[in-house]
Structures are given as structure tokens and as C-alpha cells.
């Protein structure tokens, strides 16, 4: 079928889920539905369950779930509080639900991370028989100054890896049959200024890729088969052009911050993106060729994105081929579709959605 649908959320209220339609023959993108959701629960990161029958959202002070009947029929079913530190749910704290990872194997629990202050616990939620968020079954500790922004499972879904931006380390946990997790260990990031924000893993489970927000680089790790902890290979790749001015001369603050990384369906390529902290600068998108074992063979490109990316610039490869990659930004509210062909990346379609806080990450429905 030439028609594909993606869902996208917002950084700020009012809460809404936007469904866009991509025609891979006509090469067009259009908004087909704006689904209103609870006003104060905008979704800054969303993910589907293993069957794409439920959509889960990181929604300010809540974790939310929706039944997905079709691309345009999305029904709110649950809003659950952040677990762990009781101050996380206070209206007076800046703690925010930032990321969640639904398991693809039974019991299909959802693993969720708050961010900013009072974010020292990961939350595990069970789901109902239909997949709606049900109970907060575990709040497992990291450390008091933790701020996890991304997680990934190994291919067997036995080990869970977390990128701790504020504590500057990577964590490994073992998943138990109940869906709960237990600590394996942690490793510090290679540099004090790295701040790991995102992790992705090769389908072999041999290699882990850690995106460093402040370091603006992608670091390659091998997973130790005995301990299952990530071991840095001392191979890293730039996510902003080497030599570019990366500090504001007046304030000394960083001008760029790396965002997310994701593999293509085949596992042969990895995309990663970075955002700029000023609207008059551009963000960047990088592509990497991976060897069969999972090690990075070559960085293929480092292209500027149309805007800074704002809070977003999230790169989202489709899940049925290596051909299509969506990129969203919340500086101007664009959804853009890129074609990955012969190891070149080019834009084929875009649509602007001028809504508050649009657009966060895009997820592929079909």
C-alpha cells in the first residue's frame, strides 16, 4: 500500500495526537486527524505496544495510554502518576515524564523514566488484557541525581540499558519473568562532559550505541558477554561538524545538544540527530553504516536539518524497510519525510502543523 500513517505529539499543552499520512508514490505528507486528548497531558514521547493496538505517552506529570482502533480513532484509556519519589508528582516541581519503552514480549510491561529533579526511580507498569496501562508494579532505584532520557532492551529482552544524562553513566538491569527488573551495574560515560541521552542496540545484541547530548557524539560500546555491561570501544563519531563553534562566546553555554539515534529495519544503518540551542542555527542528522556484527563501519553523512530542531529533531526510520525516515521539529512545526537511497539522504515531502509544541517524535502506524 502506498499510504502510511504516523502519529506525533507535542511538548506543551493543549494535549493532542496528530495523525499524518504519507503517500510513497505521490510523495506527499498531509495532516488527516487531530485527536484531542486531556489538555494538560501533552505527549512529548510516544510509543506503540507490540501489536500497535495501544499507544503510550510520556505526558508531563502522567503516563498515558490510548486504544488505537485505526489511524484516526485513538481513545484515551488511562493516565497514571509518576512513581518513586513522591515529590515527582508535585505541581511545584519540574519533574516530568520523559520516556517510556513498551516490552515486546510477555508480560508486556511498560518501562518509564521521569526526568529533571526527583527522577531517581524507573517506573514499571503492568498492562490490562487489552494492553492499557494498569498498575505501577515497581519503582526501581537508580541514584538521587539520575535523569534517564532513553532506554533500550537487548534482542532477547533480558537486559535493559538506560542512558543517564544527569548522572553521566549507562546502567544495565536484568528483566525478571514478572516484568520487574534488578540491577546489574553501571558504567561512567567516557568523558565528564558527555551526558548520555539515548541508546540503541544492534539486532545481534553485540553492540550498543550511546548518544551523548552534551558531547554531541555517538559512542560505540560492545556488550560484555559475561557481565552484560557495556564496554566502550573508544570509537566515537561526531554529531555536529568538527571545528564548528559549539559554545556561545557570551555565555559559554553549549550551542548544540544531540537528540536521538535509531536503527533502520535491516540493522545495516543507524541514524542519529542533534539540535541547535538557537533558532538561527541548524541541527544535524547523521547516518552510519554498520557491519554484520554491529560495529560501526563508517559515518556516511552529517547533513544540516532545516531548523534548529527545537526540543525535537527526532529521527524516526520506518519499520518495514530502510527507505523512509521521518524527522520532526518543534521550532516551526514541520514533519519531513526523507528517502534513504544508495546511502544518500534526500527530502521528499514535508507538512507544517502550526500547533503549540508540535512536533515531538513520530511513530509509524502502518
Residues of each region from the PLM?
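Blade-loop segments of beta-propeller domains
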Residues: 30-107, 300-302, 306-309
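Asp-box/WD-like beta-propeller blade repeats and closely related beta-sheet repeat scaffolds
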Residues: 73-154
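Loop/turn-rich, solvent-exposed surfaces of beta-rich toroidal or solenoidal domains
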Residues: 254-327
Amino acid at each position: 500500500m502506498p499510504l502510511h500513517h504516523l502519529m506525533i505529539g507535542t511538548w506543551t499543552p493543549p494535549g493532542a495526537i496528530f495523525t499524518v499520512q504519507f503517500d510513497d508514490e505521490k510523495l506527499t505528507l498531509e495532516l488527516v486527524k487531530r485527536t484531542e486528548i486531556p489538555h494538560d497531558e501533552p505527549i512529548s514521547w510516544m510509543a506503540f505496544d507490540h501489536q500497535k493496538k495501544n499507544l503510550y505517552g510520556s505526558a508531563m506529570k502522567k503516563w498515558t495510554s490510548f486504544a488505537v482502533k485505526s489511524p484516526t480513532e485513538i481513545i484515551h484509556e488511562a493516565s497514571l502518576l509518576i512513581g518513586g519519589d513522591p515529590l515527582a508528582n508535585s505541581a511545584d516541581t519540574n519533574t516530568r515524564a520523559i520516556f517510556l519503552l513498551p516490552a515486546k514480549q510477555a508480560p508486556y510491561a511498560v518501562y518509564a523514566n521521569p526526568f529533571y529533579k526527583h527522577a531517581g526511580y524507573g517506573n514499571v507498569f503492568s498492562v490490562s488484557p487489552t494492553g492499557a496501562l494498569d498498575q505501577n508494579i515497581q519503582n526501581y532505584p537508580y541514584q538521587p541525581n539520575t535523569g534517564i532520557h532513553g532506554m533500550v532492551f537487548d534482542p532477547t529482552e533480558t537486559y535493559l540499558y538506560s542512558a543517564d544524562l544527569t548522572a553521566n553513566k549507562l546502567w544495565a538491569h536484568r528483566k525478571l519473568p514478572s516484568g520487574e527488573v534488578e540491577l546489574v551495574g553501571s558504567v561512567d560515560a567516557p568523558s565528564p562532559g558527555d551526558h548520555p541521552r539515548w541508546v540503541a542496540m544492534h539486532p545481534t545484541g553485540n553492540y550498543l550505541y550511546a548518544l551523548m547530548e552534551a558531547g554531541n557524539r555517538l559512542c560505540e560500546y560492545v556488550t560484555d558477554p559475561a557481565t552484560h555491561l557495556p564496554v566502550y570501544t573508544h570509537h566515537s563519531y561526531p554529531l555536529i561538524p568538527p571545528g564548528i563553534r559549539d559554545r556561545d562566546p557570551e555565555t559559554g553555554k553549549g550551542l548544540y545538544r544531540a537528540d536521538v539515534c535509531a536503527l533502520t529495519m535491516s540493522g545495516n544503518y543507524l541514524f542519529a540527530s542533534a539540535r541547535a540551542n538557537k533558532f538561527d542555527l541548524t541541527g544535524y542528522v547523521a547516518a552510519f553504516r554498520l557491519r554484520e556484527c554491529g560495529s560501526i563501519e563508517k559515518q556516511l553523512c552529517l547533513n544540516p536539518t532545516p531548523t534548529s530542531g527545537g526540543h525535537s529533531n527526532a529521527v524516526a526510520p520506518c519499520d518495514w524497510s530502510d527507505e523512509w525516515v521521518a524527522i520532526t521539529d518543534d521550532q516551526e512545526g514541520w514533519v519531513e519525510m526523507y528517502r534513504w537511497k544508495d546511502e544518500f539522504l534526500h527530502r521528499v515531502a514535508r507538512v507544517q502543523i502550526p500547533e503549540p509544541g508540535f512536533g515531538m517524535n513520530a511513530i509509524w502506524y502502518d
